[in-house]
C-alpha cells in the first residue's frame, strides 16, 4: 500500500520563532495520531548587501547588511483526516512562511 506523506517547509528570519512553530506543528500531528519525521534543519540562506555610506563620494566608507533565512523541514507520514483538520486550524506567527506539499 502506498503511504501518504505531507511535507511542510518552514522559513523565517528569526530561528526562535521558527523552532516554536515547528514544535507546535509536531506536537499537533503527534497528538492526532500521525507519525512525524523532523523538524530537520536545512542550510541557512545568507544574503550580504554592501552599500556606500556617503551619497556622493568616499568609496572607502561602506556599510554591510546581512539577511539570514532559516529553514526547517517536517514530514508527516500517514496523516489522518483529524490530523489535516488540526493542522489547518493551527495558528502560526506572522513571521513564518509555510509551504505544504502532499
From Swiss-Prot:
Top-level taxon in the UniProt lineage: Bacteria
Coiled coil: none
InterPro entries, per database record: Ribosomal_uS10 (IPR001848), Ribosomal_uS10_CS (IPR018268), Ribosomal_uS10_dom (IPR027486), Ribosomal_uS10_dom_sf (IPR036838)
Pfam families: Ribosomal_S10
GO BP, one annotated term: translation
Record keyword Ribonucleoprotein present: yes
Keyword ATP-binding set for record: no
Assigned GO CC terms: ribonucleoprotein complex; ribosome
Gene3D superfamilies assigned: Ribosomal protein S10 domain
Disulfide bonds: none
Record's keyword terms, sorted: Ribonucleoprotein, Ribosomal protein
MF GO annotations: structural constituent of ribosome; tRNA binding
Assembly description: Part of the 30S ribosomal subunit.
Annotated function: Involved in the binding of tRNA to the ribosomes.
Family statement: Belongs to the universal ribosomal protein uS10 family.
PANTHER family found in the cross-reference section: 30S RIBOSOMAL PROTEIN S10 FAMILY MEMBER
The name this protein goes by in its record: Small ribosomal subunit protein uS10
